A protein has these predicted regions:
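Catalytic-site neighborhood detector that most strongly recognizes the C-terminal catalytic loop/helix
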Residues: 56, 113-117, 213-238
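Long, amphipathic, Lys/Arg-enriched alpha-helical "connector/arm" segment
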Residues: 49-76, 86-89
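Short, polar N-cap/turn motifs at the start of nucleic acid-interacting alpha helices
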Residues: 101-108, 185, 201-224
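Short, basic (Lys/Arg/His-rich) helix/loop patches that form interaction surfaces
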Residues: 137-142, 153-211
Length: 246
């Protein structure tokens, strides 16, 4: 239970993965008559899950990354990330992109996404089109997710994306405030959040963005929007409510 885990250093989502795997194994054993024990169905045998605080890259930060002079290997990683940041596609779909998905005449990208098996049609951003043309009218080669995440952190540091970000993490059942350099929080999935957040901030309607990201509800979509408390406060300060004369 949660009390016993509080003595350790595991984070809730790590514990959740352990429990989820264990429940799957026990369910298989039960359904295939290896055991009659069905305790895994009990309510207290739950999967732990915590909403993890994540970041996104602003368009200014993406531009800094885009302008870096890099070797061929690093360029492929950077360019794949930029494509994801302006299409909202998951890493798994970026890895599947082929020339047949690209329509340069109408500047559209069309693909059936792997996770949700949904057809999405995405306008081709000028940066995305430039990247495809750079690689001979096709997508850049994609590395393994683990390698990509490692390289991205280094490239974001090189691009000067090093401002400090404070978040709250749970470890050993205790919440702590932890500070990271932003570059160290970047993963391939940051690109998808960056697309959703930047499009939302640009005033594109949520439902239009959801047609691209594949979110079925606005509630699940809003979890992708990563506007910091400082950005929110600055936006609010421009509202007439905060502009009243004393």
């Amino acid at each position: 239970n949660e009390a016993s885990h509080s003595r350790g250093k595991y984070k809730p989502n790590v514990i959740g993965k352990f429990v989820k795997s264990m429940k799957a194994m026990l369910r298989y054993a039960y359904e295939n008559n290896y055991t009659t024990n069905d305790d895994f169905k009990r309510r207290e045998f739950k999967v732990y899950k915590e909403n993890v605080e994540t970041v996104y890259l602003t368009e200014k930060e993406l531009n800094s990354l885009y302008k870096l002079e890099l070797n061929e290997n690093d360029s492929c990683v950077r360019d794949s990330f930029i494509v994801s940041s302006y299409t909202g596609l998951r890493y798994s779909d970026i890895a599947r992109l082929q020339q047949k998905h690209l329509d340069f005449e109408h500047k559209l990208l069309t693909i059936v996404t792997q996770k949700t098996n949904t057809l999405v049609v995405i306008p081709m951003h000028p940066k995305v089109e430039a990247i495809f043309r750079k690689y001979g009218y096709q997508p850049p080669k994609v590395q393994s997710n683990q390698s990509t995440n490692r390289v991205l952190k280094r490239l974001c540091r090189k691009a000067g994306i090093t401002n400090f970000v404070s978040i709250v993490e749970t470890s050993g059942g205790i919440k702590h405030e932890v500070t990271y350099e932003k570059c160290d929080m970047i993963t391939s999935h940051t690109a998808r959040r960056s697309f959703a957040t930047n499009a939302y901030r640009a005033g594109i309607p949520s439902l239009s963005i959801m047609q691209i990201t594949g979110h079925s509800t606005e509630t699940s979509f809003m979890k992708y929007i990563r506007i910091s408390k400082e950005e929110n406060a600055i936006a609010l300060s421009k509202h007439t409510f905060f502009q009243a004369n004393v």
